[in-house]
UniProtKB/Swiss-Prot annotation:
EC number(s) on file: 5.2.1.8
Function: Involved in protein export. Acts as a chaperone by maintaining the newly synthesized protein in an open conformation. Functions as a peptidyl-prolyl cis-trans isomerase.
Cell compartments where the protein resides: Cytoplasm
Chain spans, region Disordered: 439-475
PANTHER family hit by this protein: TRIGGER FACTOR CHAPERONE AND PEPTIDYL-PROLYL CIS/TRANS ISOMERASE, TRIGGER FACTOR-LIKE PROTEIN TIG, CHLOROPLASTIC
Encoding gene per record: tig
HAMAP family per UniProt: Trigger_factor_Tig (MF_00303)
All residue ranges annotated as the PPIase FKBP-type domain in the record: 165-250
GO cellular component: cytoplasm
UniProt GO BP: 'de novo' cotranslational protein folding; cell division; chaperone-mediated protein folding; protein transport; protein unfolding
Protein name: Trigger factor
Catalytic activity: [protein]-peptidylproline (omega=180) = [protein]-peptidylproline (omega=0)
Keywords: Cell cycle, Cell division, Chaperone, Cytoplasm, Isomerase, Rotamase
Length: 475
């Protein structure tokens, strides 16, 4: 096998491989000889089939197998001999010729690929980060405990008009220009006035109603509403009030805690505190991680593989356009041209790829590994995020090993960050919750999870639709 480098520019490589016809002929003869004693053909005694007859019957199929074996094995061995790590799977171009299958021509093919850049890892001691730590006010815990226990609150039927805080039972039918729309109807819907469960203007118009009332209200869907066909549109809802309930006094005690599955109020407060600490701790870590990545970004500047950059940019660009589409907005609405947005996200893609390569190199150098238990935990966390679909999600991961492997990269990255935190200077700083939550320029485009379909009148509670919410009843 003759191996010739035909291109070596930057990270790009092209290798020409020629397997002489005589080498192919030798491999074919070996396979035919091996088959001769095993094949059973009518008219011939075992082991007595003439070579010419075997070649006529099996020659081309055997040669095709030989060529496939070469294509499978050669790239790996060539890259190993050259001590190169390809950024992506090499592209193989084959010189197709019928004579090759007949063993009368050399087998020529080429490899085209980009190599990963050689990265010299620098010292980390100069990196300094501020770790913001916020004490959790007791009032935050009190408020969250009240929210958790609000689901245990009892309501009593009332005769008078509804007030904010009351619960009403209603039937409703939504219409656009007089025509009912999908997801815009429900029967026996329970709505607590003032909960902001529905879109702005809906609940407010139900203050003052009584059981038996029928009314039509007009509302406008928010411009950034998740359902694009409803965003910014005026709608009317025909509403029938079936009952009005006043809230009973909310009891904050051990008995209430037991109703939500905990043995005591103290245990509930402990769980709530842990959840809030986890939430703020995650925010603290993200800010620290951002500082580390900024420092690494300033320390490293090297050529990156165009193939990786193209994939990263396309992923970002697809998500950006999907987000705009869901919000019913355009680049002009965001105050930027599409061309300018492309430039900005191209820079972001470069940063992501470069930092990914740096973190990967650091991890390999210091021996960071992701074990099977960590992968299993990541799978279970994914499953947990889709209540009611646990079996389907678990089956997906069982049948799709590459999906499990995709969870390895973020775990690996976080373990590298853990390593770096032990090497750099970290200064803790006490801050208020408001200071901790203060927004800063995002480096990464947030990951979005697929969302289940929801009722058209339910207000979107966050910038990203949660996949955990249950689907609404259909009209």
């Amino acid at each position: 096998m003759q191996v010739t480098e035909t291109l070596n520019e930057g990270l790009k490589r092209e290798i020409k491989i020629v397997v002489p016809a005589k080498d192919l002929e030798e491999k074919l003869n070996e396979r035919l000889d091996d088959t001769k004693g095993k094949v059973r053909l009518n008219g011939f005694r075992p082991g007595k089939v003439p070579g010419g007859h075997l070649r006529k019957m099996y020659g081309k199929s055997f040669m095709a197998e030989i060529l496939n074996e070469i294509l499978n094995d050669a790239p790996r061995s060539i890259l190993a001999d050259r001590n190169e790590r390809p950024a992506m799977q090499p592209k193989i171009d084959i010189d197709e010729d019928e004579k090759i299958l007949d063993g009368k021509a050399d087998f020529t093919f080429s490899l085209k690929y980009e190599v990963l850049p050689k990265i010299e890892i620098k010292a980390f001691e100069h990196i300094e980060v501020i770790r913001e730590i916020a004490a959790i006010p007791e009032k935050d815990i009190d408020e969250q405990v009240n929210r958790v226990l609000s689901s245990t609150r009892n309501y009593s039927l009332k005769e008078g008009s509804s007030e904010e805080g009351d619960r009403v039972t209603i039937d409703y039918l939504g219409k656009l220009e007089g025509v009912p729309f999908e997801g815009g109807a429900d029967n026996d819907a329970q709505l607590i006035l003032g909960s902001k469960q529905f879109i702005p203007g809906f609940e407010e118009q139900l203050v003052g109603v009584k059981a038996g009332d029928a009314k039509t209200i007009s509302v406008k869907f928010p411009d950034n509403y998740s359902a694009v066909h409803l965003a910014g549109r005026e709608a009317e809802f025909d509403i029938t009030v079936k009952a009005v309930f006043r809230p009973d006094e909310l009891k904050i005690d051990d008995e209430a805690a037991k109703k939500v599955g905990l043995e005591s109020l103290d245990r509930l407060r402990e769980v709530v505190r842990g959840q809030i600490e986890s939430q703020y701790g995650s925010m603290t870590r993200q800010k620290v991680k951002r500082q580390i990545l900024d420092a690494l970004d300033a320390d490293y500047n090297f050529e990156i593989p165009e193939g990786l950059l193209e994939i990263e940019f396309n992923n970002i660009w697809a998500q950006v356009n999907d987000d705009l589409k869901k919000a019913g907005r355009s680049f002009e609405d965001e105050g930027v041209t599409e061309e300018k947005a492309r430039e900005e996200y191209h820079v972001l893609a470069q940063r992501r790829v470069r930092l990914g390569l740096v973190l990967s190199e650091i991890g390999m150098k210091v021996g960071v590994k992701v074990n099977e238990d960590e992968l299993k935990a990541a799978v279970f966390e994914q499953v947990r995020q889709y209540p009611g679909q646990e079996k389907e999600i678990m089956d997906f991961f069982r049948k799709t090993p590459e999906a499990v492997e995709n969870l390895r990269a973020p775990i690996f990255e976080e373990k590298v960050i853990d390593y770096l935190l032990a090497q750099i200077k970290v200064t803790d700083k006490e801050v208020t919750i408001e200071e901790l939550m203060k927004e800063y320029d995002e480096t990464d485009v947030p990951e979005e999870k697929p969302a289940k379909k929801k009722s058209a009148v339910k207000e979107k509670s966050a910038e990203k639709t949660s996949a955990k919410k249950k689907a609404p009843k259909k009209a």
